[in-house]
């Protein structure tokens, strides 16, 4: 749970800077975040093999975002916190590591990550009044590596590829 700040809850208007007015919102609700996590990990010593995977999901109700209203006549911006819903994200990963020879000196590893975020807030462009904005972000990553290890030397070669795509919707 996340409580709104006391200044956000007070029903007052701070116009000490006439071009940047801040209003409170006594109707703000607390934010609640729910998290869900699954995790699995296994290691087989005989084969020097490891497997790990996890999935996380998080959702926030009543997030707090500042809503801006622009006054064309005075040029003043009025900012007021508002509750907004729709913020959530999901993440997952998979890792596999194993020896590829019977002596166990050569190994390979793969680590894959996936993430999706849905972030909702208010956005004001070119002095306009705030509009609800949703940013949808997708991330995918892969790391591959191969290594050699003996009692006095360890050498690894690895490569990483990451993809990130974000889209905004007003």
PLM region descriptions:
Residues 1-170:
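Exposed, low-structure sequence patches enriched in small/polar residues
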